[in-house]
Amino acid sequence: METKIFAHRGARWCRPENTLASFQQALREKADGIELDVHLSKDNELIVIHDETVNRTTNAKGFVHDLTLSQLKTLDAGCNFKLQASSPLLTFIQRFRSLLIKKIYTHEKIPTLGEVLDFLEANNFTGCLNIEVKTDHIHYPDIETILSEEMVQRELSFTYLYSSFNFRSVELLHELEPTVDLAYLTYNNQNEIERGLEADFITALHPKKSYALSKHFESSRKPLRVWTVNAERDIKKLLTKNVAAIITDYPEKARRIRKQCQK
C-alpha cells in the first residue's frame, strides 16, 4: 500500500496557509490530498481558516464567528506569511525568498469552502479533500448540517472526508452522511484513540505524529493519517510503518522521500 501525501493547509511552507495560493501550490507539488479547516462566519458562511480568530494570519483581530463574510473578505490573509526554513544553511536565502513571496501574496483573501471547491474542480483535482471541522474550541450551531448540505449538492471530481477533534461533530456528520469517510483527530490520549477505534462509524484515525512514531505503536485496526510530519527522518519512519497518509507542510519533499522508500 502506497502512503498518501496530504498537503497540510495547502503547501503552507511556501504560501499563506488555507488560501487559494496555498492550494494551487499543493496541486503543483502533486499532493494526493489537501487538508483544510472550516469555521462559520457571523452570517453562517463556511470559512476556510485554521484559528478561531483572524489575529495570527491576517491584518485584523477578532473571532471568525463575530465577522460577516463581507468583513472577512476585506482582510489580508497573506500579510503575516513567513517562508518556513527547511535547513539552517538556507535560512538567509529563504528569508530573501520569503520577502519576495510575501510581497506577491499580500492581499491574498480568506476563501469560503465553496470557493475552494470551485477552484479544485476548475483545476481538475482528482485526489482527496480532508475537511477538518473546527469545533473543538467553539461549537458553531448547525455547522455540520451547513457543511453537509454544501458537499452533497455537488458532483465532485474528487473524494472528500471529514475530520474533527470533536467526537460529537463526527457523530453528527455520520448521521447526515452515513457512507462518508470520517476521521477522529487525536493527540496522544490513549482513551481518545480507543474511542476512535471502537466507534464503527469512524473509518480512520488522525493521530499526532508522536503517537505513530512511538516505540509502543506497532499497528492499528484502522487506517492512520498522521499529522503534522515535516522532518525527513519522521517521514521515512512513518513510510516504513505503512501509514495510510502523511499530512505535511512539504508535499513535494514528502513525495520525493516516498519515491525512495516505497519503490
Regions found by a protein language model. Name each.
Residues 1-263:
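Phosphate-group recognition and catalysis centered on beta-loop-alpha active-site segments
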